[in-house]
């Protein structure tokens, strides 16, 4: 099993460490050539946290947006954390256009406040159990479509969800020692292959 990690900007190295800890091979995807070379070998894709506007621009500049979108729509399992969640959203409240726009949800950017307003908590995540959650200016999922399953909420706000082959979290599971959400994603990848 090999999981690609979008490595244009953001917390990609931390995701690679977690996958390594779980005995799963990962590959950093920095451009279209990387993605096309590895696409047939990929069991899944991680879209890490970072700055979503910058990542969206880089995806467009590298001509990666459409090929990645097509792969996701064709069933490639994807895990978007924080900015990665924003990239997957069909609608972003403060923007006119979405990026990949594959997941039926409306997202509000930076809803968890400024960097100084970032926080840590623990909450139940369906299918995983009670897990630690680190929020860094995290987005909030304002609403989800019919086919989207809400996996976790904090303060009555949606912070994790799944729609078919797409898993998202507003928080950064890669910044804790708890690997269960990554294991949940790996299990999704195994089911698809």
Curated annotation (Swiss-Prot):
**NCBIfam families with a match to the protein in the record:** PLP_synth_Pdx2
Q: List the disulfide bonds.
A: none
Q: Which gene encodes it?
A: pdxT
UniProt GO MF annotations:
glutaminase activity; pyridoxal 5'-phosphate synthase (glutamine hydrolysing) activity
Gene Ontology cellular-component terms listed: cytosol; glutaminase complex
Q: Known HAMAP family for this protein? A: PdxT (MF_01615)
The record, for InterPro entries, names: Class_I_gatase-like, PdxT/SNO, PdxT/SNO_CS
* Oligomer and partners: In the presence of PdxS, forms a dodecamer of heterodimers. Only shows activity in the heterodimer.
Say what the protein does: Catalyzes the hydrolysis of glutamine to glutamate and ammonia as part of the biosynthesis of pyridoxal 5'-phosphate. The resulting ammonia molecule is channeled to the active site of PdxS.
Listed under catalytic activity are: aldehydo-D-ribose 5-phosphate + D-glyceraldehyde 3-phosphate + L-glutamine = pyridoxal 5'-phosphate + L-glutamate + phosphate + 3 H2O + H(+); L-glutamine + H2O = L-glutamate + NH4(+)
Name of the protein in question: Pyridoxal 5'-phosphate synthase subunit PdxT
Active site residues according to the UniProt entry: 82, 172, 174
Look up the domain of life of the source: Bacteria
Taxon lineage: Bacteria, Bacillati, Bacillota, Bacilli, Lactobacillales
Q: Where is the signal peptide?
A: none
**What EC number(s) is this enzyme filed under?**
4.3.3.6, 3.5.1.2
Q: In which pathway does it act?
A: Cofactor biosynthesis; pyridoxal 5'-phosphate biosynthesis
Q: Which Pfam families match?
A: SNO
């Amino acid at each position: 099993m090999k999981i690609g990690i979008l490595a244009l900007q953001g917390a990609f190295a931390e995701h690679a460490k977690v996958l390594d800890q779980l005995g799963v091979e990962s590959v950093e995807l920095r451009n279209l050539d990387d993605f096309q070379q590895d696409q047939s070998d990929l069991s899944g894709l991680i879209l890490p946290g970072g700055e979503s506007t910058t990542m969206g621009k880089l995806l467009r500049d590298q001509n990666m947006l459409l090929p990645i979108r097509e792969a996701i729509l064709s069933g490639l399992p994807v895990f978007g954390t924080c900015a990665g969640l924003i990239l997957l959203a069909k609608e972003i409240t403060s923007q006119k256009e979405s990026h990949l726009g594959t997941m039926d949800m409306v997202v509000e950017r930076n809803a968890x406040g400024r960097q100084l307003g970032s926080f840590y908590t623990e909450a139940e995540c369906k299918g995983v159990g009670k897990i630690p959650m680190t929020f860094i200016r995290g987005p909030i999922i304002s609403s989800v479509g019919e086919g989207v399953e809400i996996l976790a909420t904090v303060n009555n706000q949606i912070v994790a969800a799944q729609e078919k082959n797409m898993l998202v979290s507003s928080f950064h599971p890669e910044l804790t020692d708890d690997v269960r959400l990554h294991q949940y994603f790996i299990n999704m990848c195994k089911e698809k292959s």
